[in-house]
């Protein structure tokens, strides 16, 4: 639905899904004493309900998305095209996760306090990073729509506007975390010592100071994916994996916890070093293709 220009209804269904998830958590865990299984059932059930609601609404409101009898037949060209876009996206997250695992193994050698600090700081950081994922998803849709409509002149304008929004948000997020970071990290730990809170705040602030490079990672990577060049997403993930791996193997053992704090920022910068030239390459390639098509049509 977002690709069709409707982002409000998915948000409504997401809110409904979250409310159902909370209600089912209370019922399954507190009333039915199902424990971890109850939490899993609540999550799956709420997501299933949200998916069904989206499907029903989509079929009623968007005629172009209604599946006809003829469309039930498998189309190998379409399957190949979807796999060409989807498989690289899946591999991207897998490759990035490899670097994170190697880094985490290095952090584990620093002791329980360091592990707890990274865990608490990461949870707060991930909360603020949700906005970057939203910006990326927006640009994936925007890029795909404009490439499909052959309005390549709008790509740069959209990228600029989204980047400015992300930069402003990054500054605001850093200010919030600077003044309230320790308190926010304290919400995710029990029996928090001063050393733990100071370490988690250090981790949080160092990561937040590099949110602007993260803006470009999400905005450009998702946009390139939406433009149909998913392979570049894999390569950017490889750059992130290499950065985190090098930090985990060489930097963390020497510089300790502070070295671990700089792992993700370095990964984001490494990804940007690849993604920014990749965007201009992709855009020029599309422009050349469009010019050839116009010349042939004339």
What are these model-predicted stretches?
Residues 27-34, 94-123, 127, 145, ...:
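Helix-terminus/linker motif at the lipid-water interface of multi-pass membrane proteins
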Residues 19-30, 55, 101-105, 127, ...:
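Alpha-helical transmembrane segments of multipass membrane proteins
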Residues 8-15, 53-56, 71-102, 106-107, ...:
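Hydrophobic faces of transmembrane alpha-helices in multi-pass small-molecule transporters and flippases
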Residues 1-2, 10-18, 39-54, 133-136, ...:
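Short runs within selected transmembrane alpha-helices of multi-pass transporters and secretion channels
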Residues 1-10, 115-181, 214-236:
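Small-residue-rich hydrophobic transmembrane alpha-helices
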Residues 6-7, 35, 111, 229-230, ...:
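Short loop-to-helix capping motifs
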Residues 31-87, 143-210, 251-298:
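Short alpha-helical transmembrane segments in multi-pass integral membrane proteins
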Residues 18, 22, 26, 39, ...:
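Hydrophobic positions within alpha-helical transmembrane segments of bacterial inner-membrane proteins
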């Amino acid at each position: 639905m977002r690709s069709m220009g409707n982002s409000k209804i998915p948000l409504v269904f997401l809110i409904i899904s979250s409310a159902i998830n909370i209600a089912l958590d209370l019922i399954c865990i507190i009333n039915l004493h199902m424990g971890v299984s109850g939490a899993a059932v609540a999550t799956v059930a709420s997501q299933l309900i949200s998916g069904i609601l989206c499907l029903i609404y989509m079929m009623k409101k968007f005629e172009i998305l209604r599946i006809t009898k003829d469309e039930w037949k498998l189309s190998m060209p379409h399957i190949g095209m979807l796999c060409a876009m989807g498989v690289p996206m899946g591999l991207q997250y897998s490759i990035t996760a490899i670097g994170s695992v190697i880094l985490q193994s290095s952090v584990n050698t620093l002791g329980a306090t360091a592990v707890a600090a990274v865990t608490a700081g990461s949870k707060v950081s991930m909360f603020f990073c949700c906005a970057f994922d939203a910006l990326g998803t927006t640009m994936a849709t925007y890029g795909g729509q404009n490439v499909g409509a052959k309005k390549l002149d709008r790509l740069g304008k959209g990228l600029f506007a989204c980047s400015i929004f992300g930069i402003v948000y990054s500054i605001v997020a850093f200010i919030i975390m600077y003044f309230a970071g320790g308190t926010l990290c304290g919400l995710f730990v029990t029996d928090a010592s001063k050393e733990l809170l100071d370490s988690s705040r250090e981790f949080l602030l160092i990561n937040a100071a590099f949110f602007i490079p993260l803006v470009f990672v999400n905005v450009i990577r998702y946009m390139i994916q939406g433009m149909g060049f998913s392979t570049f997403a894999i390569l950017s993930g490889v750059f992130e994996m290499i950065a985190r791996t090098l930090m985990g193997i060489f930097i963390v053992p020497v510089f300790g916890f502070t070295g671990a704090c700089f792992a993700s920022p370095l990964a984001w910068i490494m990804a940007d070093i690849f993604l920014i030239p990749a965007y201009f390459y992709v855009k020029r390639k599309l422009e050349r293709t469009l010019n050839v098509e116009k010349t042939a049509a004339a």
